[in-house]
């Protein structure tokens, strides 16, 4: 019988992810249940860590509503930015672009920057 270790709703908190992973035995199937991004201080580090675990350890990663909002914003930044911003998107955008979390965000221009500068992470999501 397969054992599973599931993690969800990390919301950009890399430290919390590291703490949770300390409880994983390394043998159980690791499953991420989505909502890896938004609100927290380091969505980029969370995505990089989870992507590495998927590629190197065979972890499974499901998308949550926050990943969906992120991708919707990238597809149509003019229409979707306000909704995404209200759900913690600015912290993810700034984290991905390597800026201070309180830096101003420019919905359309930053969508292009995220697509260009973090294409591997966007593809992963």
Regions found by a protein language model. Give the residues of each.
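N-terminal active-site segment of His-dependent metallophosphoesterases
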Residues: 1-49, 59
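Active-site neighborhood of divalent metal-dependent phosphoester bond hydrolases
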Residues: 39-125
């Amino acid at each position: 019988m397969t054992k599973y270790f599931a993690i969800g709703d990390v919301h950009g908190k890399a430290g919390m992810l590291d703490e949770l992973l300390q409880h994983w035995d390394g043998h159980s199937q690791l499953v991420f249940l989505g909502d890896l991004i938004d609100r927290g201080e380091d969505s980029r580090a969370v995505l990089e860590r989870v992507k590495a675990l998927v590629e190197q350890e065979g972890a499974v990663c499901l998308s949550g509503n926050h990943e969906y909002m992120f991708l919707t914003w990238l597809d149509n930044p003019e229409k979707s930015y306000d909704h995404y911003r209200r759900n913690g998107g600015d912290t993810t955008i700034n984290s991905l672009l390597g800026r201070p979390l309180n830096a101003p965000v420019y919905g359309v221009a930053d969508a292009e920057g995220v697509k260009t500068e973090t294409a591997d992470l966007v593809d992963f999501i």
